[in-house]
Amino acid sequence: MNKNDILRGLESILPKDIIKVDEPLKRYTYTETGGEADFYLSPTKNEEVQAIVKFAHENSIPVTYLGNGSNIIIREGGIRGIVLSLLSLNHIETSDDAIIAGSGAAIIDVSNVARDHVLTGLEFACGIPGSIGGAVFMNAGAYGGEVKDCIDYALCVNEKGDLLKLTTAELELDYRNSVVQQKHLVVLEAAFTLEPGKLDEIQAKMDDLTERRESKQPLEFPSCGSVFQRPPGHFAGKLIQDSNLQGYRIGGVEVSTKHAGFMVNVDNGTATDYEALIHHVQKIVKEKFDVELNTEVRIIGDHPTD
């Protein structure tokens, strides 16, 4: 199908106001980088997501899912096919000791709702700048907690558009990994089972984690969050720091002087700058310590053609 055929097909199953053509993706990423999407869709209902995925599958159109854009780098060549934004699926509901949240809900907001209902278990997420869908996708975690600890189930859609309800065990949550990644599923919503707590203790823990995050992380610049996974027996930031790479810069992107595990966009940096800096850091750390640094951040899209 050519782009006009795809557009007509999408307009036959979706409201026109949720379809954007040749949409710049830098508007939707924390790094403020990225080329254009052929089609950028922002459905507001689960049924619309299913319809999009089914249409794409039947017509062999690639689909890329995008949440909050906080732990992703999109190359300047953009993304072919469909980019499906889940941010409008942002409902948050509570029932006794459970919270059900849409894929596009900010996990920070869900953590705050848990606190407001005096439920403990999601304090670790109070500073994670991602969506629920992204958090399940990568089993997000911080300061000793992770999604795996409190999720009950996730409602997902497979590549054919079929609806799946996956339990914690079926999600196969591991360190920054899940069956959602492995099988290219899309999360529609997730349910969390929490425990009744004490408001002052919950708030104190969230305040402590927020203070630690603000004191250690370079929140004053655009960034993609933590760049590398934790290698066994090491800390990525410490290895980078001991390699004297803090402040090292390629183009407009540099290794943060505040936290070596972060790379910040200090001067109109590009995805190409980010990728080159990542490869340089990996090379130096490998040479100096014989340790492979694997990326936590996802790098997607086409390389620029010029």
From Swiss-Prot:
What's a GO biological-process term for it? peptidoglycan biosynthetic process
Q: What is the lineage of its organism?
A: Bacteria, Bacillati, Bacillota, Bacilli, Bacillales
Which enzyme class, named as a word?
oxidoreductase
Please state what the protein is called. UDP-N-acetylenolpyruvoylglucosamine reductase
Using the UniProt record, give the first listed, main subcellular location. cytoplasm
Tell me what gene encodes this.
murB
Q: Where does the UniProt annotation locate this protein? A: Cytoplasm
Q: What is its EC number?
A: 1.3.1.98
User: Family per UniProt?
Assistant: Belongs to the MurB family.
- Superkingdom: Bacteria
Report keywords, A-Z: Cell cycle, Cell division, Cell shape, Cell wall biogenesis/degradation, Cytoplasm, FAD, Flavoprotein, NADP, Oxidoreductase, Peptidoglycan synthesis
Q: In which pathway does it act?
A: Cell wall biogenesis; peptidoglycan biosynthesis
The residues responsible for catalysis, as annotated, are R176, S226 (proton donor), E296
State the Gene3D superfamilies in the record. 3.30.465.10, UDP-N-acetylenolpyruvoylglucosamine reductase, C-terminal domain (3.90.78.10), Uridine Diphospho-n-acetylenolpyruvylglucosamine Reductase, domain 2 (3.30.43.10)
> Could you tell me which InterPro entries the record lists for this protein?
FAD-bd_PCMH (IPR016166), FAD-bd_PCMH-like_sf (IPR036318), FAD-bd_PCMH_sub1 (IPR016167), FAD-bd_PCMH_sub2 (IPR016169), MurB (IPR003170), MurB_C (IPR011601), MurB_C_sf (IPR036635), Oxid_FAD_bind_N (IPR006094)
